[in-house]
């Protein structure tokens, strides 16, 4: 098992890059025209640039921790040559360089969301997608070879995109549901419209996560369940599935009950109670998503094959 610091850094990096990708994507499919301008609905300049800078710092910390763990070096003088080798001679190093370049460009593009909001969001979405995709090179797919490796990577990347879309949307809705936002009638109308607009996107996201999750499981473990039951990987995976099911339940509650109730309440001019109920539901769903990301970070450091062989 990896050390707690490595897991914590993986968790923070996964969360950061998913939020970055998902927020930019949300701005494109949910907001319209001038609503995309930074500060009109969401402060994209601060959110995107800040998240990109944080992602770069986390990537640097993760690289140092990974190199330290692999080399056993304890002093900087010993560690530096290993870092140079990691960056220049490994696929993980290449993916890290690509991620850092993408994040640097995102930080600049994020500053332009006031002048050219739509163009900037397109640029950030594309570049953050690249940055998010590089995380696949730190997962189980990196251990495969040939065509299996290609398809495992492809499945991982699509899975990351779908998860990022969901997490980013939850963060966006959490920001839109803040108390000072729901006091404004115009903001509440935008919230209701974006909730309705997310219904189709949310369905596609959940379906994609389910399909790619099953395919990933088959790549990593194979068509077996019994031998996995007594492993740490198996228990963590079960906890992840329980939480994911709870998230689907909350998303269904939002879609079929709470969102329509909010829209109906707006028509009657009294939407405070509906907004509060939706806020609590979204907060619970977001909390579950955070725990799921923590489990994903931990699962990525485990080898189920080794655990099953030791039984």
From Swiss-Prot:
Keywords, comma-separated and alphabetical: Cell inner membrane, Cell membrane, Copper, Membrane, Plasmid, Transmembrane, Transmembrane helix
InterPro entries cross-referenced by the UniProt entry: CopC/D, CopD, Cu-R_CopD_dom
Where does this protein reside within or beyond the cell? Answer: Cell inner membrane
Q: How does it sit in the membrane?
A: Multi-pass membrane protein
Species of origin:
Pseudomonas syringae pv. actinidiae
**What Pfam families does the record point to?**
CopD
Provide the protein name: Copper resistance protein D
One GO term (biological process): copper ion transport
């Amino acid at each position: 098992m990896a050390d707690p610091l490595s897991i914590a850094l993986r968790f923070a990096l996964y969360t950061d890059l998913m939020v970055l990708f998902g927020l930019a994507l949300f701005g494109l499919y949910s907001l319209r025209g001038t609503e995309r301008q930074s500060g009109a609905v969401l402060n994209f300049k601060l959110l995107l640039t800040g998240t990109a800078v944080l992602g770069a710092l986390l990537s640097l910390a993760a690289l140092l921790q990974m190199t330290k763990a692999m080399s056993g070096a304890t002093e900087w003088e010993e560690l530096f040559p290993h870092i140079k080798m990691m960056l220049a001679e490994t696929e993980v190093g290449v993916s890290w360089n690509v991620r850092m370049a993408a994040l640097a460009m995102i930080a600049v593009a994020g500053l332009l969301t006031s002048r050219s909001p739509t163009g900037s969001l397109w640029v950030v979405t594309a570049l953050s997608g690249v940055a998010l995709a590089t995380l696949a090179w730190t997962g189980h797919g990196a251990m495969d070879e040939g065509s299996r490796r290609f398809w495992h990577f492809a499945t991982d990347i699509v899975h990351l995109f779908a998860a990022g879309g969901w997490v980013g949307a939850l963060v966006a809705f959490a920001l839109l549901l803040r108390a000072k936002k729901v006091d404004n009638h115009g903001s509440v109308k935008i919230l209701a419209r974006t909730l309705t607009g997310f219904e189709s996107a949310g369905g596609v996201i959940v379906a994609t996560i389910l399909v790619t999750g099953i395919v990933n499981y088959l790549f990593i473990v194979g068509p077996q369940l019994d031998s996995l039951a007594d492993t740490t990987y198996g228990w963590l995976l079960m906890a992840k599935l329980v939480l994911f099911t709870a998230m689907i339940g909350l998303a269904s509650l939002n879609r079929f009950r709470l969102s329509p109730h909010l829209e109906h309440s707006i028509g009657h001019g009294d939407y405070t109670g509906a907004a509060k109920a939706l806020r609590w539901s979204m907060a619970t769903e977001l909390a579950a998503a955070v725990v799921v990301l923590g489990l994903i970070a931990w699962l990525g450091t485990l080898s189920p094959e080794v655990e099953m062989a030791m039984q």
